[in-house]
A protein has these predicted regions:
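Catalytic histidine neighborhood in serine/cysteine hydrolases
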Residues: 243-247
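Short, surface-exposed "cap/lid" segments of acyl-processing enzymes
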Residues: 1-21
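Short beta-strand/loop motif that positions the catalytic acidic residue
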Residues: 76, 219, 224-231
Length: 247
């Protein structure tokens, strides 16, 4: 119920951005808001991009019905996971010109653009993570998407977490509640050497991380990357990797 369509704080950001004369689109992620019958495919570049294109197509139809004129300029931005999603969408808009939505500019902010080389590896080196719920969220979401990360969640998490975690990601339990449940050193949550094994080249989890890197392309339209050096959730090195590749 914190999705933009519910009119909360993030929805108000959309209204603020629209005051500059922009037509602002703020989609609910799949699995959030009213689409609560599926686990949100967290940090999944393909579905993020496809959802963005589908929303643009829907708004194009609606604008015709309402008689709203648009000038054909499309700008993309987002923060944190939204930074990842906006980067995925910007890449799709550039690489698929037949979709009909040319990219005028993008401003991804503090996104985990380099999942395989930065976000996951740095997170694995920390004694504890600022928001520990993100780790099972990522693993469960990628398991739903790819289907081959593990046979049993107990391969990754120790008890009682392995048995309890799937029930917590029900669309009703808040992130802070899951964070409190997982509060403690990462070594107390996961099986010994499980994360290191999953990040070995050739492991399905590592392959999924590679599949969801969104930095390895060169924008043909203006892009500005924003990041926070004290970000405890999405490490700022993601932006530095993206900048180095794109330049």
């Amino acid at each position: 119920n914190e999705a933009p369509s519910y009119g909360g704080f993030e929805g108000q950001i959309g209204f603020l951005m629209a005051t500059g004369g922009m037509l602002c689109l703020m989609p609910d992620y799949l699995g959030l808001g009213s689409s609560d019958d599926v686990l949100h495919p967290y940090i999944h570049a393909e579905s993020e991009a496809e959802s963005g294109i589908a929303l643009l197509q829907a708004v194009e139809i609606l604008s015709d019905e309402l008689g709203i004129s648009m000038n054909g300029q499309h700008f993309v931005s987002g923060y944190s996971q939204g930074g990842h999603a906006s980067m995925a969408l910007a890449r799709r808009m550039q690489e698929d010109p037949d979709a009909g939505f040319p990219l005028a500019g993008a401003a991804p902010m503090s996104g985990p653009y380099d999942m395989s080389g930065t976000q996951v590896p740095i997170g694995m080196t920390l004694e504890s993570y600022a928001n520990p719920a993100y780790l099972p969220y990522l693993i469960l979401a990628w398991q739903q998407t790819y289907g081959n990360l593990f046979v049993d969640l107990g391969e990754v998490f120790q008890e009682p977490y392995a048995s309890a975690l799937p029930g917590y990601f029900d669309g009703e339990t808040s992130g802070w509640y899951i964070d409190n449940f997982l509060d403690g050193p990462t070594s107390d949550l996961v099986q010994p050497e499980a994360l290191e094994s999953m990040m070995m080249p050739g492991h399905p989890f590592h392959d999924a991380a590679l599949d969801n890197n969104v930095y390895d392309w060169v924008p043909e339209s203006p892009m500005r990357l924003f990041y926070c050096t004290e970000d405890e959730q999405v490490f700022y090195e993601n932006a530095l990797v993206a900048e180095a590749w794109m330049n």
